[in-house]
């Protein structure tokens, strides 16, 4: 299987480009949302990352067009090397690389639950569930975990995910103390 494009081999179903091997849903990534819905926000995010706008455009971890960070993902490279569709399929799961990756940022808080759910219901059904978890209860807009308020209507919290993890998200957004 070509992990990057989601092309499946004989007898296997196609994996959506936005279902990352680690259990992240790219549809709710700030860069993915900006790529597909908000060019102005994409410009701001690219500047913050020190990238050209074109480099910040992303169609998902399994797509051809990915950010520099996603193009160099060690988890995707490992899964491709071992022939796995998701990290949970590996005999080394959960490995130190995945554990470290999860601890680094709040949007990764539910990786293990996500991977378990993918195994239970499949990638397509899981993606629908995750999108629901990141949807504004007021207007139905999809938000990233870093959108404390809905990016469309301003409702707070922007989603069930933000409601559950607000404290750690807020802490991660604070500038480092000098």
Where are these regions (language model features)?
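Amphipathic, glycine/alanine/valine-rich membrane-attaching segments
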Residues: 12, 20, 155, 175-178
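Short Cys/His-rich micro-motifs in 6-15 aa windows
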Residues: 78, 95, 154-164
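Hydrophobic scaffolds flanking metal-cofactor catalytic centers in soluble metalloenzymes
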Residues: 2-122, 132
């Amino acid at each position: 299987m070509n992990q990057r494009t989601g092309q499946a081999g004989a007898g296997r179903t196609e994996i959506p480009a936005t279902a990352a091997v680690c259990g992240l849903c790219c549809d709710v990534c700030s860069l993915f949302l900006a790529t597909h819905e908000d060019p102005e926000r994409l410009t701001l995010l690219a500047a913050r990352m020190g990238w050209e706008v074109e480099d910040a455009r992303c169609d998902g971890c399994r797509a051809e067009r990915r950010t520099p960070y996603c193009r160099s993902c060690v988890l995707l490279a490992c899964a491709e090397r071992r022939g796995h569709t998701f990290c949970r399929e590996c005999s080394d799961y959960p490995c130190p690389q995945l554990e470290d990756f999860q601890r680094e940022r709040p949007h990764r808080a539910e990786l293990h639950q996500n991977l378990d759910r993918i195994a239970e219901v499949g990638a397509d059904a899981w993606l629908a569930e995750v999108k629901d978890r990141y949807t504004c209860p007021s207007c139905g807009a999809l938000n990233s975990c870093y959108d404390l308020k809905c990016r469309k209507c301003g409702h707070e919290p922007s989603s069930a995910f933000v409601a559950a993890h607000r404290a750690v998200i807020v802490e991660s957004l604070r500038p480092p103390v000098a």
